[in-house]
């Protein structure tokens, strides 16, 4: 029996002119979403799952190297109310409508190629993909690396990743401020990058409690992490706030090392700071819908995090809990968010 969708989710997904929405779904809900003739699909990300047999052959799919905290296969589904068409250019595949494109690439993460070279090559392929689709403004990146904090020939893999991303962005990124991104470590499968891009750029938002990540001091590596803390993307009828992976960092330093409760409190304070900064640009409304992705170093952390998020967001959020390594070994949790507000 197919699981039904909430009236609010249906309204957001199907309002004429609304470009896109994201849903985190188990297998039964994913089947319902993907079989609905009133929706088109931009892309699907699987967690703890390979491509399901109920997915249309033309639907872009990427298997992420992260596992759901529940142990049950989960799917991240980007749907569109505008017709989509599949597109594949070189190693990058995805789908687009007239305003937005979803794409994904598997990293060539092998022993005989330096990670920074593989990352640079992948990002340059992404920029080639965007140029050919005509949707040239990247608005959100997700970078999922296996063994993200492991040492690789004397240099942490995440630092090598940042070197490669920095090279590609220096060569091809049009905007002076980099887009929102997350970087999280996985434990199985293949390292992947997936992304959203649009015809029009998003407006960057920074956190007054933190140093901009792209301005971090060199103690974090020879190349700073090139991402913004948040941004607002405006489409026809929807305002979308993207919040990057957010953790217990103040200034540029980790706070509450080894203290889960302290890190939860600091992380939610950073989320509140970003929401306040965004609301100075775009007022929220009672129709706001939140989709949260929570990365847990240990799945036992889920219950206290869930309690904190329920206190902060109530029933207005759709959370997905994933087992993943944060890009600093002293961070226990990381939370990212998408808020969609129907304008008018």
Regions found by a protein language model. Give the residues of each.
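N-terminal presequence-like segments and the immediate start of the first folded domain
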Residues: 1-344
